[in-house]
Every structure is written in structure tokens, then in C-alpha cells.
From Swiss-Prot:
It comes from the Eukaryota. InterPro entries: Globin (IPR000971), Globin-like_sf (IPR009050), Globin/Proto (IPR012292), Hemoglobin_b (IPR002337), Hemoglobin_oxygen_transport (IPR050056). GO terms for biological process: cellular oxidant detoxification; hydrogen peroxide catabolic process. This is Hemoglobin subunit epsilon-4. PROSITE patterns: GLOBIN. It comes from Bos taurus (Bovine). The lineage of its organism: Eukaryota, Metazoa, Chordata, Craniata, Vertebrata. Keywords: Heme, Iron, Metal-binding, Oxygen transport, Transport. Heme b binds at H64, H93. Belongs to the globin family.
Length: 147
């Protein structure tokens, strides 16, 4: 289990309060699909994913990105029980969707990049470390059913 300090929790929560979930979520998922094109196979129903501009403008990518980032909001509220918080999603991604758990880490990295882009002044090394710890912990929680 990952332990978050009071300072780490406060840092994550302070930035989260400023996040536009739709924008950051959509951009994060779009970046994942562009930079790691093999991840597109999990989104066959999303339609046109044939170019960077098609992915960035795809409403299904934006909607699912928002959904993914909303789950991070849930994580922030339950930082002391991430495995329990993500148990159902872990089971879904493992047993039904068969998503390679490495993709969770890759998406976490995309979220960090987008946050750093949108909040460059607030995204200090300490902030980045707190968010990196959270995205890694969420990735591990999502991969829990794989073990």
C-alpha cells in the first residue's frame, strides 16, 4: 500500500481543484492514442482514429478521457484505499477488456504531461512528484487483478 503524506495529499488536491476534467482528460487520452498507437485497438468503437487531428477532435475520445480523469477525482478522495477504489475497474480491464497493465502507467505519464502543460507555474518538482506517486499508485491499483 502506498502512503501519501499530508503535504502530498494537499498538493494533489490543490491542483485538482483547478483541473478542467473534460479538457485534461480528453487531451491525456488523445496523447496516449497518438504516441502509443497500439492502444487504439481497445477503442475500435470510437470511429476515426486515423490521424492526430482526428483523434484530438474525436468526441468519443474526449468523453472517455473525461471519464478516466473523473476516476482520478475518485482516487484523490480515496488515496488511502486505491486498491479498493479501483477493484471493479481492475477486474473489468483485466478479465473483460484484457488491457495490458503497462498501458495504465503510460496513461498516467500522459496525464502528467498534460497537467504540466496546463499548469506550468504550479507544476513544481514537488507537485510533479506527488502526482507521479498518485498516477503510479492508480496504475498499480488498476493492475491489481492481474497478479
Amino acid at each position: 500500500m502506498v502512503h501519501f503524506t499530508t503535504e502530498e495529499k494537499a498538493a494533489v488536491a490543490s491542483l485538482w481543484a483547478k483541473v478542467n476534467v473534460e479538457v485534461v482528460g480528453g487531451e491525456s487520452l488523445a496523447r496516449l492514442l497518438i504516441v502509443y498507437p497500439w492502444t487504439q485497438r481497445f477503442f475500435d468503437s470510437f470511429g476515426n482514429l486515423y490521424s492526430e487531428s482526428a483523434i484530438m477532435g474525436n468526441p468519443k475520445v474526449k468523453a472517455h478521457g473525461r471519464k478516466v480523469l473523473n476516476s482520478f477525482g475518485n482516487a484523490i478522495e480515496h488515496m488511502d484505499d486505491l486498491k479498493g477504489t479501483f477493484a471493479d475497474l481492475s477486474e473489468l480491464h483485466c478479465d473483460k477488456l484484457h488491457v495490458d497493465p503497462e498501458n495504465f502507467r503510460l496513461l498516467g505519464n500522459m496525464i502528467l504531461i498534460v497537467l504540466a502543460t496546463h499548469f506550468s507555474k504550479e507544476f513544481t518538482p514537488q507537485m510533479q512528484a506527488s502526482w507521479q506517486k498518485l498516477t503510479n499508485a492508480v496504475a498499480n491499483a488498476l493492475a491489481h487483478k492481474y497478479h
